[in-house]
Amino acid sequence: MPLQVSDYSWQQTKTAVFLSLPLKGVCVRDTDVFCTENYLKVNFPPFLFEAFLYAPIDDESSKAKIGNDTIVFTLYKKEAAMWETLSVTGVDKEMMQRIREKSILQAQERAKEATEAKAAAKREDQKYALSVMMKIEEEERKKIEDMKENERIKATKALEAWKEYQRKAEEQKKIQREEKLCQKEKQIKEERKKIKYKSLTRNLASRNLAPKGRNSENIFTEKLKEDSIPAPRSVGSIKINFTPRVFPTALRESQVAEEEEWLHKQAEARRAMNTDIAELCDLKEEEKNPEWLKDKGNKLFATENYLAAINAYNLAIRLNNKMPLLYLNRAACHLKLKNLHKAIEDSSKALELLMPPVTDNANARMKAHVRRGTAFCQLELYVEGLQDYEAALKIDPSNKIVQIDAEKIRNVIQGTELKS
């Protein structure tokens, strides 16, 4: 049964009440103060002070100062008036209980409102941070597009200049060919003139030497061969057969069926898209791409904005729930936020999608085992965590970090801490 304190003193003005309460040697750490607009309680075991105030006060602006084994309260009145007494008189036990319960309810409602206001402010901060990040991403994307456009314009100009140079060079070659052809024609004409002149002189000489009455014949006949242009080449075609993509695995260790199944699952995952989402109408075209959302989540994770990264991965998973890297990256975010059960669920889902086990997905499977094992260990489920770490070591036996962590878990299970 606490001892009621009655040796207090108080003074007042029209706007405030000043109450001095001795602590009677009780440590300040053991003192509990509860104040509402109509009720004041100070509990410092084994003593208790209660005051059912004469009129309402402004408990938010009121203050309490502790020092020299005394608590001094400054209580500001809601209405400027002089009080007859500090506590209201003529109050029975039932009335006191109702005032206590009402004060507790008021304090609970105020605490609830403060919690909701804090949560709303946190959501607004997250929304603002996400909008700022998206704005930065948009500016970077626009900058990259402008750079691409400038490079495209430069390349187009260079290509046009090269085409113009080729056209002029072709025209120059054509002119040179025509000039050579004209020179050849002139040479042929000159050769013909020379041949005609020689044949004429020979005919005249033969006529002069031949007997009378005998017909003379021109025994000189000349055939000129003109240069002929070769015919154009015939059209042909070359058939190219591309080799199929194969994994760099020795034939004796090959898992052809599993590797083909993994490639098939990857292709199916890239084609699987869920567009029946109401929020899609408010998104831009690139924001509807799971790969773009995954990259955005990775950048947000790098800036330690884990909640925004989870939001990006959530939307990407709603668009395409067959991509294991989305679950794997979201598990890393949940680990950072200590959402351990969710981290275990996402790691397990990633391992389910990373089947069948092949060399191409070995690194992702190793990370999934490590993240799930880390979550188990933080939940103090060390045996399950060690099983995941051993599975990771089977995939990558040369990973020194995983080896050290697995050894630490074994020591915890055996009851001995590994000396660092």
Curated annotation (Swiss-Prot):
GO cellular component: cytoplasm; cytosol; dynein axonemal particle; extracellular region; neuron projection; nucleus; plasma membrane
Domain called CS: residue spans: 3-87
Localization per Swiss-Prot or TrEMBL: Nucleus; Cytoplasm; Dynein axonemal particle; Cell projection, Neuron projection
Protein name: Dynein axonemal assembly factor 4
Organism: Homo sapiens
Alphabetical GO biological process terms: cilium movement; determination of left/right symmetry; epithelial cilium movement involved in extracellular fluid movement; establishment of localization in cell; heart development; inner dynein arm assembly; learning or memory; neuron migration
Associated clinical condition: Dyslexia 1: A relatively common, complex cognitive disorder characterized by an impairment of reading performance despite adequate motivational, educational and intellectual opportunities. It is a multifactorial trait, with evidence for familial clustering and heritability.
Oligomer and partners: Interacts with ZMYND10. Interacts with ESR1 and ESR2. Interacts with STUB1. Interacts with DNAAF2. Interacts with CCT3, CCT4, CCT5 and CCT8. Interacts with DNAAF6/PIH1D3.
Stored InterPro entries: CS_dom, CS_DYX1C1, Dynein_assembly_factor_4, HSP20-like_chaperone, TPR-like_helical_dom_sf, TPR_rpt
Role summary: Axonemal dynein assembly factor required for ciliary motility. Involved in neuronal migration during development of the cerebral neocortex. May regulate the stability and proteasomal degradation of the estrogen receptors that play an important role in neuronal differentiation, survival and plasticity.
SUPFAM superfamilies documented for this protein: HSP20-like chaperones, TPR-like
Keyword Nucleus included in the entry's annotation: yes
Source taxonomy: Eukaryota, Metazoa, Chordata, Craniata, Vertebrata
Keyword Repeat: yes
Keywords, comma-separated and alphabetical: Cell projection, Chromosomal rearrangement, Ciliopathy, Cytoplasm, Kartagener syndrome, Neurogenesis, Nucleus, Primary ciliary dyskinesia, Repeat, TPR repeat
